[in-house]
Amino acid sequence: MGLRPAKIDRDVDKPAYTRREYIRGAPGPKITIFDMGNLSAEFEYEVSLHAEQAMQIRQNALEAIRIQVNRYLQKNVGRSNYHFKIRVYPFQVLRENPMATGRKADRYGNGMRRPFGKPIGLAARVRKDQKILTVWVNGQHLKFALGAMHRAKMKLPYSAYYRIYDKEGNDVTTKVLSTMKL
């Protein structure tokens, strides 16, 4: 069966369903790498993407964000000039009650009898204003980090915003953006 539309799974409207020891057939995570780039260097700025509201991000979207942002930064900045980290993990198990459709579906379908559903995927639950991903760069590469965040925002189910922090953790978004030429 194909992938369902993301709007079905993006709301946090059900209780958490994460206890894998009780879930038969729960799928494994597709995303396995959470830190990319130069992990040991110190950088001037931290650019983080925050959620504007609570949401669930499917593991397919997280993997697409990881590939897109990492490839963009490698191409424009170079592997040793950034550190990229995904800060959420897909714990939430998504379920689907498969409905039989078509001719003679009533013969073999269950309908709403025992409709709990079977595990079909994983998602990360994100709270409002929580950091989703972070890129550390120096001042000359800040423009590319903001471009990477813009590309990542397009793959999220709801809107998000980014913030720029200095080494001490102070929010310098307005100061930096006013001096930058985009």
Curated annotation (Swiss-Prot):
One of its GO terms (cellular component) is cytosolic large ribosomal subunit. InterPro entries: Ribosomal_uL16, Ribosomal_uL16_arc, Ribosomal_uL16_CS_euk_arc, Ribosomal_uL16_dom, Ribosomal_uL16_euk_arch, Ribosomal_uL16_sf. Gene3D superfamilies: Ribosomal protein L10e/L16. GO terms for molecular function: structural constituent of ribosome. GO terms for biological process: translation. Keywords: Ribonucleoprotein, Ribosomal protein. Belongs to the universal ribosomal protein uL16 family. Part of the 50S ribosomal subunit. This is Large ribosomal subunit protein uL16. The gene is rpl10e.
